[in-house]
Curated annotation (Swiss-Prot):
It comes from Cronobacter sakazakii (strain ATCC BAA-894) (Enterobacter sakazakii). Homodimer. Pathway: Cofactor biosynthesis; biotin biosynthesis; biotin from 7,8-diaminononanoate: step 2/2. [4Fe-4S] cluster binds at C53, C57, C60. It comes from the Bacteria. Belongs to the radical SAM superfamily. Biotin synthase family. The gene is bioB. It is an enzyme of class 2 (transferase). Binds 1 [4Fe-4S] cluster. The cluster is coordinated with 3 cysteines and an exchangeable S-adenosyl-L-methionine. Binds 1 [2Fe-2S] cluster. The cluster is coordinated with 3 cysteines and 1 arginine. GO terms for molecular function: 2 iron, 2 sulfur cluster binding; 4 iron, 4 sulfur cluster binding; biotin synthase activity; iron ion binding. Its EC number is 2.8.1.6. This is Biotin synthase. InterPro entries: Aldolase_TIM, BATS_dom, Biotin_synth/BioAB, Biotin_synthase, Elp3/MiaA/NifB-like_rSAM, rSAM. GO terms for biological process: biotin biosynthetic process.
Amino acid sequence: MAHLSRWTLSQVTELFEKPLLDLLFEAQQVHRQHFDPRQVQVSTLLSIKTGACPEDCKYCPQSARYKTGLEAERLMEVEQVLDSARKAKAAGSTRFCMGAAWKNPNDRDMPYLEQMVQGVKALGLETCMTLGTLSDDQAQRLGEAGLDYYNHNLDTSPEFYGNIITTRTYQERLDTLEKVREAGIKVCSGGIVGLGETVTDRAGLLLQLANLPTPPESVPINMLVKVKGTPLADNEDVDAFDFIRTIAVARIMMPTSYVRLSAGREQMNEQTQAMCFMAGANSIFYGCKLLTTPNPEEDKDLQLFRKLGLNPQQTAVLAGDNEQQERLEHALRDADNQQYYNAAAV
């Protein structure tokens, strides 16, 4: 199916209903038209402010409403964040994402957030933040500081959304994405598979993303990480083929976007991850932790890359960053023996 400027639910449902191998073949063809199939973007995610979030997202251990044993932490000092960014770069990351457990940032925190963005960019890394809902002014300030990407996930379809979150409307999420666009910041937005949604809900999520005025440049597809103490802790496991199918449909619908294999990789074996890359995933988070949930260690990722013939993508902001390229090549050669710093530990 050719890429459409605007998708309908029936067209997306038709993709989900395709035989899996046919779907993977189409997704891989689309992927090769727009990307080097051997290149994978490598990002690191750091929790710069952990826990005590007032929202009620049923999947999230950072919500103050659930007893998950997570200790709340205040906003990190700027230099602490920059130190983690330096170590992330040394381990091979080219993109550094900073997440804060807020409904929305307070204006008094904006100067520190701006300094974090400026400092990380000065290291030659792409920058991304996820801070919750933004005002017009906050989005403009982050844009002026040089923020490259802003992450704000839609999570699921509009129809299923109210079963998962009640403290923030779907429209608020869409409004924040619009403000980010208007501030000149690229959009990172995706969702979660395994919330209890139907295939129609998965189609509805991707429909919302692909039909935005400009589709997100980055689309993280998460597999639910079930955390004891959250309302979704006992949800049924996601079938691996259903997850792979979602990746493939996302690739076909948003052919020029990075599709990120995000949370839940710790639960996936190498074969499942390999099929996700075949389905068009071309970005991962690198490091043992995604905010507060487990993620494969860096050396395991590099070993898998080597087995599959994949290479970390060179996307450093500073041109001619040969030192970083040498680090990555060295890491790939020595993946069996080296241990890498967990830049996302908090």
